[in-house]
Amino acid sequence: RISLMAGCYARGIDWNDYIRQISTLPQLQKADIMAACQHYFGNHYLLFHKKFGKYKKDKISKPPYAPVQTDNQNRQSDYAVQLAKTATPTLTPQFIALGKEVTTRHLGPQADLYTTANPQNDIFRLTLSWHQIQAEKPIHTMSDLFDYLGTSTLSKQAFAKQLQALGTTLSGNYALGGMSIQLSGFDNNLAPSIRLLTDLLQHPKTDKKFVATMKKDARLGDKFFGKDMEAIHEAVLDKIAMGDKAFELQNMPTSELKRLQVADIEGLFKAAQTGKLTVSYSGNIAADSLANLLKPVTEDENRQDYKGYDYEVKRPEKPTIYLYDKADARQAIVGTYTVLPPLDTEEKEALFTIWRNYFSNGSLNSVLFRELRDLRSLVYTCGGRAYTQWFKAKKNRPIGYFTTAGTQTDKALTTLSLIDSLLTDMPIDAHDLQNAQQSAMNNINNSRPTFRNQPGYMAEAVLEGYTEDPNKARATAINQTTNAQVIAYYQQHIQHAPRSYFIIGNLKAIDRKALERYGKVVVEFKKDDIHR
């Protein structure tokens, strides 16, 4: 709502006029929509074709600029000082409670239901999530299956037509951590919608067209992976932190995917239903009535427990330099990698969260952004990324922390040197530390899920080992954390911690001799090391 208000203000639209405009939406009829489509979607259109390639680089001289004066970087204008004196209410965080906002029911072995009431209308949303690790499966391409799936008695078109007659939509997702299917429609058509879903789950049918499409998408994915700098960046970080457990390495090899037939795909769809099941629902059907409707889906008792993705961050024995060559890259991505102690209490998690906000993840207010971009114009982007454990039982494992920065290739080593020095000698500003703490609290306040997302939120929390909203304990810990504690955490665990380094870009333009100051061990990744 705030975003809509801001958009109206920016375009000079009166908010009341906007409200009056959207209030006419319920009066629209199907004929109105059809008439608009027939009027605008005619034979007069532009057709765009996309062609991959690269332009010849222009050689331009660096424009002159005046250095930024840094002696008053924390000075505030009179307006900002006056604004800070304005009284503002203190927000009390709102948390989700099982038994209050969210009702639960046990559906059977490894199957649970989470529901919440819909106070606004009679539209439901039902999500079934089967949780299991699906390594060595075609996880990058299976999600498209839901556009080609029918049953043994209903073709895809016939199945979709029956859903449409009920006013119900179906979508699905197939990923490394499991499979999910979401239904949305009218509460009075929930029962027939679930019957159709049951038929789909028990008697899935697809065709050769999907298999051909899936194989084509896999080939294109392999072809274009090396062209996407951000995809390479993520895959390299995963490989450094997770080794052979890196997400990109869990997909089915293309050579094996080529041999898949229709029966194999249907078998994978059925096998995905053997994971731990959580069902999330928002609507006006009572939990007990819904549990009864779901019996045909939950009667199979061969589901397995789920303990999350099992990995431990890799700790290099010596400071290591990780390299990935992208010969046609105009820019480079550089950064550091550090293994930090476990975040096995809310207090430790609060310390790391506040420090990370302050140093790398506080957007315009972070140390990295100010030092690398504001004051020196060295980078295009910068930030931090943490590899933490989500399941409570695994919180006793160390975490991995990266700094990252995108810069010009000829500035790569300068940028890396500056990041390294900032980690060793971090500038400390009490006001910015307070802002980092407030940002952590703002994230909790702003992340409270809407009613439709509350069942899924609590289902995930319970799955990860929590008995209540995990943000409740986090908020308490963040509020009780002091600047002195954050500084001590940095000095004890980060300031002198062993670091490794990475560079992604055109390695021919990198001075290998100068790199030796960061470490003697060099690991140079190839495409097959980070992508399958």
Describe these PLM feature segments.
Residues 1-25, 46-51, 61, 120-147, ...:
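M16 family metallopeptidases and their MPP-like homologs
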Residues 257-260, 265:
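Alpha-helical scaffold elements lining the catalytic groove of polysaccharide deacetylases
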Residues 199-208, 296-304, 376, 421-428, ...:
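A common structural junction motif
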Residues 8, 16-132, 136, 266, ...:
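Proteolytic maturation boundary segments
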